[in-house]
UniProtKB/Swiss-Prot annotation:
Region (Interaction with the F-box domain of F-box proteins): 108-167
Location of the region described as Disordered in the Swiss-Prot/TrEMBL record: 216-240, 330-351
Phylogenetic classification of the source organism: Eukaryota, Viridiplantae, Streptophyta, Embryophyta, Tracheophyta
Entry protein name: SKP1-like protein 21
Organism: Arabidopsis thaliana
Biological function: Involved in ubiquitination and subsequent proteasomal degradation of target proteins. Together with CUL1, RBX1 and a F-box protein, it forms a SCF E3 ubiquitin ligase complex. The functional specificity of this complex depends on the type of F-box protein. In the SCF complex, it serves as an adapter that links the F-box protein to CUL1.
Length: 351
């Protein structure tokens, strides 16, 4: 405190003790000469007139706790005594700041709150020597600071108000690292796009449930292959059955054709008929060419017609029992030109 400020203080305000209240609510009584060494306390006494009694104690800032206040007053007691040499003060200061980093930081903060600049400078120089030559990671480890800065924030350019060449070089290095960081981020984004998860919902559910999607796919493919084989076997079986039916029909047709051929030959041998036609069972008044053979005796012709009809009737009844309803009755006809034809049901159009 300067001599001018000391002269302003009235005699009645000069007390032997000043009452101070810390942030935790505790009240301390400190010598006036020691307390007035702190500019903040001196201003409170002069401007507000507080600190003269316990009921009007001076409220100290939040960062000043009782332990730090005791250290600050020890420093003030030593330095407020006149007549000490600079060497003595320097030795005392070196011993005074021998403490751990945490307490040194708290002391710096408390001295700054009380506006005690000599002590702030002393503790700040001590902190500067501690962090000198350390990397940001080491500094955070020393002061137990969390690494809450992103890579881009760490590489932001520094302000170079004094045009320091070292800061210029450092900013160039930061710019290069920022460029490399952006390139790495681009590569990562490309890799993420390439490795897009294309699994189906079933595979994802299987993965969540702890099953192997490959096993599920294998079982599904086996089921599909089994179904395909069953369908192929069913279609082949159906094809074979259809072929067997067709072959059976062809056999029955060929047998029927042989029967008809044999019947026709037998009929020709037994009756010695000169000819046969398919339209024998058409009405007697209708003939294919409208021709009537006048050389055949009508009585003999009538007898032959009856024999042919009777034979055809018996032949038809035997065919129904042998091949069912697949064939129509075989009709024989004899026309006047001495030729004969046979009809075999649906194949009547073939001669």
């Amino acid at each position: 405190m300067s001599e001018g400020e000391m002269a302003i203080i009235k005699p009645e305000m000069m007390k032997s003790y000043i009452w101070l209240e810390t942030a935790d609510g505790s009240i301390q009584q400190v010598e006036q000469e020691v307390a007035m060494f702190c500019p903040m306390i001196c201003q409170e006494v002069i401007q507000k007139g507080v600190g003269s009694s316990k009921n009007y104690a001076i409220s100290l800032p939040q960062r000043v706790n009782p332990a730090m206040l005791s250290l600050i007053f020890d420093y003030c007691r030593f330095h407020q005594v006149p007549g000490r040499s600079n060497k003595e003060r320097k030795v005392y200061d070196e011993k005074f700041i021998r403490m751990d980093t945490k307490r040194l930081c708290e002391l710096t903060s408390a001295a700054d709150s009380l506006q005690l600049k000599p002590l702030v400078d002393l503790t700040s120089r001590a902190l500067a020597r501690i962090i000198e030559g350390k990397t940001p990671e080491e500094i955070r480890e020393i002061f137990h600071l969390p690494d809450d800065l992103t890579e881009e924030e760490k590489l932001e350019p520094l302000k170079n108000t004094m045009d320091d060449p070292r800061i210029r070089l450092l900013n160039r290095l930061y710019a290069k690292k920022r460029k490399e960081l952006k390139e790495r981020e681009k590569l990562k984004s490309v890799e993420v796009e390439e490795h897009v998860d294309e699994r189906s919902v079933d595979d994802l559910l299987s993965f969540i449930n702890g099953r192997d999607p490959k096993v599920v796919k294998t079982s599904k493919s086996k089921k599909k292959n089994k179904k395909r084989k069953e369908q192929k076997n069913g279609s082949s079986n159906g094809t074979c059955e259809a072929l067997e039916k067709d072959l059976h029909n062809l056999d029955s047709k060929s047998q029927s054709a042989e029967i008809v051929d044999n019947t026709a030959s037998c009929l020709g041998d037994v009756s010695n008929l000169p000819s046969m036609e398919d339209d024998i069972f058409t009405p007697k008044t209708e003939f294919e060419d409208g021709y009537i053979d006048d050389e055949i005796d009508p009585a003999l012709k009538e007898l032959l017609d009856r024999e042919v009809e009777d034979f055809a009737r018996r032949l038809n009844s035997s065919w129904v029992l042998s091949i069912g309803q697949e064939r129509q009755p075989v009709n024989f006809s004899i026309n006047g030109n001495g030729t004969s034809r046979r009809l075999t049901g649906p194949a009547a159009g073939h001669k």
